[in-house]
Regions:
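Iron-sulfur cluster-binding cysteine motifs and their immediate structural context
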Residues: 396-413, 430-446, 475
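Short, surface-exposed secondary-structure boundary micro-motifs
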Residues: 308, 475-477
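Residues forming the flavin
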Residues: 1-365
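Short beta-strand-centered aromatic/proline hotspots
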Residues: 478-492
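Ferredoxin-like iron-sulfur electron-transfer modules
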Residues: 1, 228, 287-290, 351-356, ...
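Short, solvent-exposed secondary-structure boundary/capping segments
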Residues: 490-504
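Short, well-ordered loop/turn sites that connect or cap secondary structure elements
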Residues: 463-465
Length: 519
């Protein structure tokens, strides 16, 4: 079995097949295996079976350890330059080109970043979001100091937050689309840090002679053309582009696999087993359609099981039982507001019939007069969680984290979290640290006369110290009141998410959502 690509899909497929007795060999053009996982320092969504609340790079480490355990051979710095219908590949390793013939081939080459053409787009300082992640999270280099992000999908939102974690200033986030494209919880944690969102805006030009010194954006109309007089200038040294991905399917086309043009790119036509139109050639992960890494790992396992059956290492009954199990996991991830069937559509109500926050879609944060309508936001005496998760997304770690049963989601993991008023919160903070979207806060009024406390997730360095005085910012990233740090907690179970507690006036405990130290 030959696997092309040592990312989440490729490694998962190789492991699945190796468990059944196959001897997979995996080729990857990079110096390290793991694909995009090692760039991803954020916690994943989903449930336990999807590695929810585990950081991406740790999932990568687990996959590599499992691949080693089952004897998967991984060849690095090896670029596959040819794939042929007879299940043959040519691989460039150093100065040599080698030829391999397999009994089955899985293509898991992933995707490449899209670019946008505008005046000055080739200047040094214009980079892709993936490049920014590589610089920060693999090489520990700041991509720039003042950055404008173009793109409000999950990649743009997550990378914007990581840029701030790396010490960069994100001066604005723009997107030509009229609505935020990614998860609202990702947008909210960027907005409360003070980053303004400019929806229905795109880049007109980048300024600077030899490198980026500024950028001009403008508002687009219904015809996607710039509206005269709407230009806005920002002093920046870096422009980061997060405008989608395209499947890297060239090898599949070379192998004469039947392809399909979709809005997501040029993808192979595959059956439920990952099999293409060419017998013995399979595809999994982003090369067969752009999704999250969690989905890619499941697709990889499905293809690995299918190849094991194709080569006689599993019966069809065993394969189908395994595929049914994995399909169930995959279907779970494809539910909710961001399900494939809803792409490009405006979903106006949650599954519970609650009006979605238009402010969240248009500005990146839920307005104060909207937040109260959601079931995770309640007023109680004593310390209690406030869950500002307002969209149906597949995620339930908060329910599992609370050992007192204060939080309930139910069997459908896309249901909005709700608070059980009959259960007593003990303020352990496990729900706060476990929330992949950082949307849970602990609130308590009357800690002392006229003042309450808000406990929030915090992942920035340097950490504030107890006694520090600063300001509390609201959901919109603007000043709401003075604040004092009263507690900072950490624990191995929090996985580097600190719990920062600030003291604010009682009437601000439902508004203060971020702490900023006084300059």
């Amino acid at each position: 079995m030959i696997v092309i690509g040592a990312g989440p899909a490729g490694l998962s497929a190789a492991i699945e097949a190796a468990k059944k007795g196959l001897k997979p060999i995996v080729f990857d053009e990079n110096a390290k295996p793991g694909g995009q996982l090692f760039k991803q320092i954020h916690k994943f969504f989903g449930s336990k079976e999807h590695k929810a609340k585990v950081r991406g790079f740790k999932i990568g480490q687990e996959l590599l350890a499992e691949a080693e355990e089952y004897g998967v051979e991984v060849v690095l710095n090896a670029t596959v330059v040819g794939l042929y219908p007879e299940k043959e590949v040519t691989v460039k390793v150093g100065d040599k080109v080698k030829h391999y013939k397999g009994d089955a081939v899985l293509v898991a080459t992933g995707a490449s970043e899209n670019m946008v053409n505008f005046e000055g787009w080739t200047k040094p300082g214009v980079i892709g979001a993936g490049a920014a992640q590589t610089m920060m999270n693999l090489h520990h280099i700041k991509p720039g100091n003042r950055i404008l992000m173009l793109g409000s999908g999950n990649v743009g939102l997550v990378v914007s937050y990581q840029l701030m974690q790396a010490g960069c200033e994100v001066v604005a986030l723009a997107d030509a689309a009229p609505r935020v494209g990614g998860y609202g919880v990702h947008a909210a944690k960027v907005a409360r840090c003070g980053v303004p969102f400019y929806l229905s805006h795109t880049i007109i030009r980048v300024e600077g002679d030899d490198y980026v010194t500024g950028v001009v954006i403008g508002q687009v109309g219904p015809d996607w053309k710039i509206i005269p007089g709407t230009e806005k200038h920002f002093d920046v040294d870096t422009v980061c582009l997060a405008v989608g991905l395209s499947p890297m399917s060239q090898l599949l086309k070379q192998a004469e696999v039947r392809m399909n043009d979709t809005k997501g790119g040029h993808v192979p036509v595959c059956d439920k087993y990952g099999a293409t139109s060419v017998p013995g050639i399979y595809a999994a992960g982003d090369v067969s359609g752009i999704e999250e890494a969690s989905s890619a790992m499941i697709e990889g396992r499905m293809s690995g099981a299918s190849i094991a059956c194709y080569l006689g290492y599993m019966t069809e009954e065993e394969r189908d039982a395994r595929i049914d199990e994995l399909e169930g996991q995959l279907d779970t991830l494809r539910q909710g507001m961001f399900a494939p069937k809803n792409r490009g559509k405006l979903v106006e109500k949650t599954e519970e019939g609650i009006d979605v926050s238009m402010n969240l879609l248009n500005k990146g944060y839920v307005a104060d007069d909207e937040i109260e309508r959601f079931p995770g936001v309640t007023h109680q005496k004593g310390i209690h969680p406030v869950i500002e998760c307002t969209q149906n997304i597949p995620c339930n770690p908060c329910q599992d984290a609370c050992k007192k049963g204060c939080i309930r989601i139910g069997k459908n993991i896309t249901s909005l979290p709700a608070i059980d008023p009959d259960k007593k919160c003990i303020g352990c903070g496990m729900c706060v640290a476990s929330c992949s979207g950082q949307s849970i806060f602990l609130v308590e009024e009357d800690v002392e006369e006229g003042y309450g406390e808000v406990t929030m997730p915090y992942e920035f360095l340097p950490l504030p110290e107890v006694g520090d005085k600063g300001v509390a910012l609201g959901r919109n990233g603007k000043y709401v009141c003075e604040a004092e740090v009263t507690k900072i907690r950490t624990a191995p179970a929090f996985d580097h998410t600190y719990l920062l507690t600030i003291k604010v006036p009682n009437d601000m405990v439902m508004k203060a959502r971020f702490y900023k130290k006084e300059a």
